[in-house]
Curated annotation (Swiss-Prot):
SUPFAM superfamilies: omega toxin-like. Disulfide bonds join C51-C65, C58-C70, C64-C81. This is U7-theraphotoxin-Hhn1a 1. InterPro entries: Huwentoxin-1 (IPR011696). Ion channel inhibitor. Expressed by the venom gland. It comes from Cyriopagopus hainanus (Chinese bird spider). Residues 1-19 form the signal peptide. The lineage of its organism: Eukaryota, Metazoa, Ecdysozoa, Arthropoda, Chelicerata. The keyword Disulfide bond applies. The presence of a 'disulfide through disulfide knot' structurally defines this protein as a knottin. It comes from the Eukaryota. One of its GO terms (molecular function) is toxin activity.
């Protein structure tokens, strides 16, 4: 009986240690992912956009990208960039 209780307590202790390790690893991974997202966000903010992307609002002074065309779409009350059925060349 004492052996069974000791085994159960030991198993619970092992599970607690493993759980703590996984939680610490998950937290480190989460922090690393957050840093990566912030780096990508900062890099994209520095790029100047010359054209409007898909479903973006467009006017004469805000043109759509090459593979998009500016169209009036009902019930939206302004022009938006929609696909012109072509693909951008890379």
């Amino acid at each position: 009986m004492k052996t069974a209780i000791f085994t159960v307590v030991l198993a619970l202790a092992v599970f607690a240690v493993l759980s703590f390790g996984w939680e610490a690893n998950e937290k480190a991974l989460s922090e690393e992912f957050t840093e990566l997202i912030h780096e990508k966000e900062a890099a994209s903010e520095t790029e100047a956009r010359e054209c409007r992307y898909f479903w973006g609002e467009c006017h004469d002074h805000m043109p759509c990208c090459d593979w998009l065309v500016c169209r009036y779409k009902w019930p939206i009350t302004y022009n938006i960039c929609v696909w012109n059925r072509t693909f951008p060349e890379k």
